[in-house]
């Protein structure tokens, strides 16, 4: 979306709910268990939100950190390619890794299907049973080969597997005595399967349209990185949430169709279109999260005013804070003070805070030693919604706390510690609640989604790619 994949401990969703953050490892499948194999090597923890923080709201649901802003973003070079825009002659296909499995896989077809693999090809209808014997995939007992493609035919052809219905086809790869399951689906149907899980279908069309373009762009960016791999994305907040066709609505499909083929580019290439639930008043620059710069991910004013995500307050204690540091292997003994620049009004960057005020690092000084932790580490250890926060020892702050005052010194054993924070998610790219507010106030002219995107992504172009 958006740690994600770093905090990815929160990281995708993101970009939104704030309870998932991220990074998945490959685990071997057992019996009927479906496992998402790990994303290609990543250097950040799952904050998927943190994929670690992903939460769902009732009426207006957003995945707080989707896609996770994991270190995945660090794979991008500081210099953006200036190659000319390469458009597709037709809609591209996305490969979504649904999981891995060792037991028989039941597959139901909405219509007929062609089963293809190697030199084998036959028609099938109804319910199928997919198994693996050695390095051979079998469909209804017929050997197909090391790879089988189940391709539904007819308009609206779809299949159901693993409890979900999907557009497109199913690719099954025999692997280590089990099978790897990949949904091969047109990009537009993929985006339609992402949108209702990343943004409430009841939101204004301009917000849904902006999210659709972000989801499409994010997918294309990852497809470019996945050359030579079995798949492009997973259906989790490690990337962005995708659960097939069942939750599509007229509103979400309309937003996808209205923006069909529209993609955000920088230097002629699809951008890493991260998004998150709520920027908390100001989004962050990539350089302050990853240490390298992406010119289109700059901190900007966020228009969210949503209660519960724009600002939040946690009450804890010195004892609890010491215990959490100890449990994380970061014990400093009895806390004396926290070295951290007091939270100010954005934009205002300091050595330990980004332009939005998000914590880059904080030092905990104790009786035995001192430890410096990154904002993402603290978000994970303390279970925070974002890294835009400050500590207040024995002082209960108001949401509109006057900036600049420091309350970071511990004076007694029963010190009360308040943590005032803003936003939900990694803070990079599109703020979903900010998009909602802009769409609520903007014109319903079919073009306003572009203004939303141009606000949250700096210096981009929005092009028709197919």
Sequence positions of predicted segments:
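Conserved, single-site charged/polar hotspot
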Residues: 2-466
């Amino acid at each position: 979306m958006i740690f994600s994949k770093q905090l990815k401990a929160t990281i995708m969703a993101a970009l939104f709910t704030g309870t998932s953050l991220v990074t998945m490892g490959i685990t071997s499948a057992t019996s009927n268990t479906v496992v998402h194999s790990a994303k290609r090597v990543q250097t950040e923890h799952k904050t998927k939100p943190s994929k670690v923080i992903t939460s769902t709201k009732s009426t207006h649901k957003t995945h707080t950190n989707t896609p996770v802003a994991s270190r995945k973003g660090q794979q991008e070079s500081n210099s953006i390619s200036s190659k000319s825009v390469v458009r597709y002659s037709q809609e591209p296909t996305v490969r979504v890794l649904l999981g891995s499995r060792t037991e028989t896989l039941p597959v139901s077809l909405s219509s007929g299907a062609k089963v293809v693999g190697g030199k084998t090809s036959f028609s099938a209808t109804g319910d199928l049973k997919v198994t693996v014997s050695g390095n051979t995939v079998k469909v209804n007992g017929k050997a197909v080969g090391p790879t089988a493609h189940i391709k539904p035919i007819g308009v609206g052809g779809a299949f159901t597997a693993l409890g979900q219905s999907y557009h497109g086809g199913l690719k099954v790869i025999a692997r280590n005595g089990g099978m790897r399951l990949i949904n091969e689906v047109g990009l537009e149907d993929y985006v339609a399967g992402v949108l209702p899980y990343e943004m409430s279908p009841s939101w204004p069309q301009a917000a849904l349209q902006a999210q659709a373009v972000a989801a499409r762009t994010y997918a294309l960016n990852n497809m470019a990185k996945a050359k030579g791999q079995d798949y492009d994305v997973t259906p989790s907040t490690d990337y962005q949430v995708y659960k097939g066709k069942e939750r599509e609505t007229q509103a979400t499909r309309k937003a996808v169709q209205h923006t069909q083929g529209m993609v955000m580019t920088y230097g002629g290439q699809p951008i890493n279109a991260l998004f998150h639930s709520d920027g908390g008043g100001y989004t962050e620059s990539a350089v302050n999260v990853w240490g390298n710069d992406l010119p289109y991910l700059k901190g900007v004013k966020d228009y969210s005013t949503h209660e519960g995500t724009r600002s939040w307050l946690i009450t804890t204690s010195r004892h609890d804070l010491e215990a959490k540091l100890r449990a994380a292997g970061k014990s400093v003994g009895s806390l004396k003070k926290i070295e951290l620049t007091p939270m100010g009004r954005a934009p205002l960057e300091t050595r330990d805070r980004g332009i939005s005020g998000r914590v880059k690092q904080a030092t905990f000084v104790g009786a035995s030693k001192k430890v410096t932790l990154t904002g993402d580490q603290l978000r994970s250890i303390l279970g925070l919604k974002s890294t835009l926060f400050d500590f207040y020892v024995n002082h209960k702050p108001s949401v509109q706390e006057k900036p600049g005052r420091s309350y970071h010194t511990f004076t007694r054993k029963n010190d009360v510690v308040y943590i005032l924070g803003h936003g939900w998610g990694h803070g990079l790219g599109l703020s979903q609640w900010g998009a909602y507010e802009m769409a609520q106030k903007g014109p319903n002219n079919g073009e306003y989604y572009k203004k939303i995107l141009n606000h949250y992504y700096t210096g981009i172009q929005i092009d028709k790619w197919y």
